Amino acid sequence: MFFDTKVLNYPTIHKSISMASTMQRTSSSAASNERQLSQLQRRAPSLMIKPTSFSNWNVAIPLLSPLAPSLTSSFDQSHVPPPQNKTEIPVEEEVKKTPVFKKWQHPASPFCYEPTTFVPPFIQV
């Protein structure tokens, strides 16, 4: 069998040409990577936002501020019944309930603990 040398050498020549061009691209791309701009540098934001200084903020944050009682209320108090007299308190509520003091318990702790049986340890000590 006779092989044509051009056919046999073609892939190696093609590889060497492509390797050389790839190396040229790599070396040129390494130099151009230093000069390339990032996406933010290439396209600047459309709106420039300047933060305001905190000394200019004179408005209280409503949810974090204490509630100031206002003298003029928007709530119509004409429909509110007058407070009841203390003489009308039922007899059951007259008995003072003594507060029950318990030891503090973590909310996630179990209500009761079941007794455990002795289990030998996995590792012999």
UniProtKB/Swiss-Prot annotation:
Subcellular location: Plastid, Chloroplast
Protein's UniProt keywords contain Calcium: no
Domain of life: Eukaryota
Keyword Plastid recorded: yes
Disulfide bonds: none
Keywords, ordered alphabetically: Chloroplast, Plastid, Transit peptide
Transit peptide (residue range): 1-46
Signal sequence region: none
GO cellular component term of the entry, any: cytoplasm
Transmembrane segments: none
This protein's name: Uncharacterized protein At4g14450, chloroplastic
Taxonomic path: Eukaryota, Viridiplantae, Streptophyta, Embryophyta, Tracheophyta
